[in-house]
Amino acid sequence: MEHPLFGCLRSPHATAQGLHPFSQSSLALHGRSDHMSYPELSTSSSSCIIAGYPNEEGMFASQHHRGHHHHHHHHHHHHHQQQQHQALQTNWHLPQMSSPPSAARHSLCLQPDSGGPPELGSSPPVLCSNSSSLGSSTPTGAACAPGDYGRQALSPAEAEKRSGGKRKSDSSDSQEGNYKSEVNSKPRKERTAFTKEQIRELEAEFAHHNYLTRLRRYEIAVNLDLTERQVKVWFQNRRMKWKRVKGGQQGAAAREKELVNVKKGTLLPSELSGIGAATLQQTGDSIANEDSHDSDHSSEHAHL
C-alpha cells in the first residue's frame, strides 16, 4: 500500500491530509506525551512551507520520511529524535530568514486552526486571495500616487503662468489706456499773448513788407523779445486775414458798381451775370498770383 507521504509529494494540494495520519501514527507508536509537540510542529511548519514555498516541499518531505523510518526502527533512540527536532527547527527558521517580505503569510500560518485538516487545506487559497488583493492594491496605489503628485506639482506652475499672463494683459491694457488718455487729454499749445507794443511794431512791418526775410525776422524777434517761430506764425496769420479782407472788399465794390449800373439801365441782367463771372475770375487770378508770390518768397528764404 502506498504511503500517504508519497501522495503528498506527488500532489501538493493534499499535503495537509497526508500529514495528518502521520501525526496519529506517531502518537500511537510512542504513546508518550513529550513527543506530541514534535508532530504538531512538523505539520504546521510543513503546511506553511508548502503554502509559501512550493520548492522546499521535497526537501522537507524527504527529511520527514527519514524521521518516520527512525521512529519505526529505533523506538528507544531519543538522540535521533532530538536531531530530527533540530532539523525541523532549522527548516522552520530558514524561510523566515531567507524571505522577510513574506512575514504576513507566515504570521497567518502560525495561527492554529481548530477545524482540522480541511481548514488547513483551505488556507492557501485565502492566502492567495490576500496576496492577489495586495498585489492589485499596490499597482493602483502606485498608479494613483504619481498622478496626484503630478497634479500637485503642475498646478502651481500653471496657476503662476495664468496669473502672469493676466497681469501682463492687465498691465498692457492699463498702459494703452494711459497712453490714449494722454493723447486725448494732451493740452493745446497756449496762444501767444502779444502786447500792444508788439502788435503795433508787427503791423507797421506788415504794412511795408508782407513777407519777411530770415534776417529781418531774426531782428524783429530780438527787438520785440519774441522767438522767430512766433514772428513767422504771426505774419502767416496776418496774410491770411488780409486776403480774406481784400477779397471781400473787391467783391463788395464790384457788387456796388453793378447795382449802380442796373439802376442807370445801362446793363441787362444777362450782362450782369457775365460781369459777375468776370469779377470772380479776376479775384481768383489775384489770389493765385499772391500764392505764387508766397511760394517764391519761401523758396528765397530757403536758399538764404
UniProtKB/Swiss-Prot annotation:
Residues 112-137 have a biased composition (Low complexity). The keyword Transcription regulation applies. Induction: Expression is repressed by ZEB2. Its main location: nucleus. Residues 87-101 have a biased composition (Polar residues). One of its GO terms (molecular function) is DNA-binding transcription factor activity, RNA polymerase II-specific. GO terms for cellular component: chromatin; cytoplasm; nuclear speck; nucleus. Coiled coil: none annotated. Residues 63-192 are annotated as: Disordered. Keywords: Activator, Developmental protein, DNA-binding, Homeobox, Nucleus, Transcription, Transcription regulation. SUPFAM superfamilies: Homeodomain-like. GO terms for biological process: angiogenesis; limb development; negative regulation of cell migration involved in sprouting angiogenesis; positive regulation of transcription by RNA polymerase II; regulation of transcription by RNA polymerase II; roof of mouth development; skeletal muscle tissue development; somite development. It is found in: Nucleus; Nucleus speckle. Residues 187-246 bind DNA. Interacts with RNF10. Interacts with TCF15. The polyhistidine repeat may act as a targeting signal to nuclear speckles. Mesodermal transcription factor that plays a key role in somitogenesis and somitogenesis and limb muscle differentiation. Required during limb development for normal appendicular muscle formation and for the normal regulation of myogenic genes. May have a regulatory role when quiescent vascular smooth muscle cells reenter the cell cycle. Also acts as a negative regulator of angiogenesis. Activates expression of CDKN1A and CDKN2A in endothelial cells, acting as a regulator of vascular cell proliferation. This is Homeobox protein MOX-2. It comes from Homo sapiens (Human). The gene is MEOX2.
